[in-house]
Amino acid sequence: MRPLAGAHTMFSCVDFTPGAVVPLHSHPHEQLGVVLQGELEMEIGGERRALRPGDAYVIPGGVQHGARAHAGPVRVLDVFYPLREDYLKLFK
């Protein structure tokens, strides 16, 4: 799904295949999210959490984080502030 952006905030729906890995990384944007489908393990600032549908997370800007999808498809809804210009350019 294409990201949806307002003047200052955006959201993006992300689908993961089973076993997909998002390596540890950081960005200056605050990121909030909720798991819509499936299960994944997230590492945020050195702390690991198992997340299921309905679970939410908050990632402050500049904090290292990554994820690993478990069996079955995983879908999350991420919200970013400020806008992720890099994401928006990918979908132009």
Indicate where each model-derived feature is located.
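A short glycine-rich, His/Asp/Glu-containing loop-to-beta-strand
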Residues: 1-23, 78-79
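Double-stranded beta-helix
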Residues: 10, 66-92
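Short, conserved beta-strand element in jelly-roll/cupin
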Residues: 15-17, 27-42
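Short beta-strand His + acidic residue motifs that chelate non-heme Fe in jelly-roll/DSBH
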Residues: 24, 42, 59, 65-70
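Short acidic-glycine-tyrosine-enriched beta hairpin
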Residues: 46-61
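Conserved beta-strand positions that form and line the central face of beta-propeller blades
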Residues: 3, 50, 66
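Structural motif
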Residues: 10, 39-41, 48, 64, ...
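A short, acidic/glycine-rich surface segment
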Residues: 20-23, 44, 88
